[in-house]
């Protein structure tokens, strides 16, 4: 989920994304990435990057998929970053230790804290996200949709089917 570090959810603009829309956006991202590659491997930033990385890997025909596990969110608040798991030695070797020829995928770049940390680890990798906010956008090489910094994206894996009251009734 996207977040501003100090704002509460009531001050953000909701942006619900359906599975169909997310899949279309990931395929559109892949069309752009196909012009930039080839890539030796995909690295998903977990957890948000797992679903888009799977779609991108399928569409690009990539079989080497790795993860970098970075924790920055607790519920709806952004906190300190921790690398819980780095990329494997085999994947790092494919990228010559700097990430050259590797594709890093995440669902969203928000403030850029996670992106900056991953960029420091793999400075030559190509960094792609489905969605980008203005603060983090400069860190991303390829993205599909820009949203405002005060937008809160509700990804399909974070939501369930439920009644939505009409906007006229004060629904956000």
Swiss-Prot record:
Major place of residence: membrane
Positions with a binding annotation for xanthine: 110, 153
Binding positions for Mg(2+) per the UniProt entry: 107
GO molecular-function terms, A-Z: guanine phosphoribosyltransferase activity; hypoxanthine phosphoribosyltransferase activity; magnesium ion binding; xanthine phosphoribosyltransferase activity
InterPro entries: PRibTrfase_dom, PRTase-like, Xanthine_Guanine_PRibTrfase
Record has Transferase as a keyword: yes
Organism: Rhodopseudomonas palustris (strain HaA2)
EC number: 2.4.2.-, 2.4.2.22
Disulphide bond pairs: none
Keyword line: Cell inner membrane, Cell membrane, Glycosyltransferase, Magnesium, Membrane, Metal-binding, Purine salvage, Transferase
Membrane topology: Peripheral membrane protein
Biological role stated in the UniProt entry: Purine salvage pathway enzyme that catalyzes the transfer of the ribosyl-5-phosphate group from 5-phospho-alpha-D-ribose 1-diphosphate (PRPP) to the N9 position of the 6-oxopurines guanine and xanthine to form the corresponding ribonucleotides GMP (guanosine 5'-monophosphate) and XMP (xanthosine 5'-monophosphate), with the release of PPi. To a lesser extent, also acts on hypoxanthine.
UniProt gene name: gpt
Protein name (Swiss-Prot/TrEMBL): Xanthine-guanine phosphoribosyltransferase
Binding site for 5-phospho-alpha-D-ribose 1-diphosphate: 47-48, 106-114
């Amino acid at each position: 989920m996207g977040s501003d570090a100090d704002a509460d959810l009531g001050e953000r603009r909701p942006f619900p994304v359906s599975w169909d829309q997310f899949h279309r956006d990931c395929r559109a991202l892949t069309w752009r990435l196909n012009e930039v590659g080839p890539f030796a491997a995909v690295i998903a930033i977990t957890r948000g990057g797992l679903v888009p990385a799977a779609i991108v890997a399928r569409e690009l025909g990539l079989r080497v998929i790795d993860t970098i596990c970075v924790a920055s969110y607790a519920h709806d608040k952004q906190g300190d970053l921790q690398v819980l798991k780095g990329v494997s030695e085999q994947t790092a070797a494919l990228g010559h230790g700097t990430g050259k020829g590797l594709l890093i995928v995440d669902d969203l770049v928000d403030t850029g804290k996670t992106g900056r940390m991953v960029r420091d680890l793999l400075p030559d990798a190509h960094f792609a996200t489905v969605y980008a906010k203005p603060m983090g956008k400069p860190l991303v090489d390829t993205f599909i949709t820009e949203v405002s910094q005060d937008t809160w994206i509700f990804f399909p894996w974070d939501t369930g089917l439920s009644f939505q009251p009409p906007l006229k009734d004060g629904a956000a």
